Amino acid sequence: MKRIFFVALISVLLAACGGKDTYKIKGTVEGLEDGTVVTLNLMGYNSLAEIDSAIVKNGKFTFKGETDTAEVAVITFDLGDNIGGCEMYLERGDIDVLINVDKGFQRIGGTPNNNAFQGFVNEIESLNDEVQELEDKIRITLASQGDCTDYYKQMGELQDRYKKILSQNIYDNAGMLHGYRQLMENYTLFEPEEVMGFLEELAPAFGGDLAFAQLTAITNAQLSVSLGHPYVDFEAPILNKKGGYYETTAKLSDYVSKNKIVLLDFWASWCTPCINEIPFIKAAYKKYKSKGFEVVSVSVDEETDEWINAVKDNGMNWVQLWNGDDDMDNSAAVKYSISAIPSTFLIDADGTIIGLNLRETELEEALEDYFKNK
């Protein structure tokens, strides 16, 4: 899933008891020449703040200092054509860092947050290899206009495995910055009920943080449009049947009231996962439109030209609405607390949300069950 809105990530600083404590970073680096300068930086929101530097000697470097917080840090070094980096947590204690520039990997440990971080990396390494291999197969198959249905199913299974590992990692480290950061960077992968469960676990350590309050507000809003709740109406600019956009608008209620079941689909032209879902939506629309199924797609594209061209290129011959500018407080995406796309809501004739984020063949299966019982 592709994020389109961001929480101001982790403003919290974990206060350590008894004032400042010392840290020592012992680094070993392979693939860097002696004399290379390595820099220790604190990670801010979209920026790095340098706090120290060291010189590589005999393949090693050291940083020493004091800290009263646990913070996200990055060790950087100049590779000539780009900047290399090693992400870690700066906290009290002895921190061990191993960097292999040529092979492109890092190993960190020695302190609680860094041990937790490395443990998570170890768990998902083989999973990442499987994902990369499957993405290559999908790319080749799509290029030859082949059928990727089985590959998409396998990708879904890999995503489920990743979520399970990530979920356990958050719960196991709920009292540490690593666990909090994992949630803040990955909450869009989970359903609102799951996020609320994480927040309850994290509240004792992080409940007073601004980002925690923001995510809580977002999650509560998402719960208001979750399974079993009534849909929320909105009005948005509509693309006419000739592919023109003339500032005319339509309401979601216009379609919910006229059809037996409606799929509300948030997407964008630049979102590859969204584009990958279109063939499945098209197949379901073709099969069930005559029975009372309608699709209402809402684009979160910033530019209307990109939206209109994508609709034409992908043959999306159902209702097309535009979310409008990101700063519209009354937009559809705001009302539905959309933090990632694609996001879909299946709404029945009574206006009740009966399905969320149905992927690939799940949509057609849900429609088959729905009409079978009607």
Report each predicted region and the residues it spans.
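Short, acidic, Ser/Thr-enriched surface-loop or helix-capping motifs
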Residues: V56, I238-L239, I347-D348
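A non-transmembrane, solvent-exposed segment enriched in polar/low-complexity residues
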Residues: C17-K164
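Conserved redox-active cysteine motifs that mediate thiol-disulfide chemistry
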Residues: F266-A283
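Thiol/disulfide oxidoreductase modules built on the thioredoxin-like
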Residues: M316, D325-K372
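Conserved segment of the thioredoxin-like fold in thiol-based oxidoreductases
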Residues: K286-M328, V334-I341
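Bacterial Sec-dependent N-terminal signal peptides
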Residues: M1-T28, K374
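N-terminal targeting signals for export/organelle localization
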Residues: I83, I95, Q106, G156-P230, ...
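A short beta-strand-turn-helix
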Residues: E235-V262
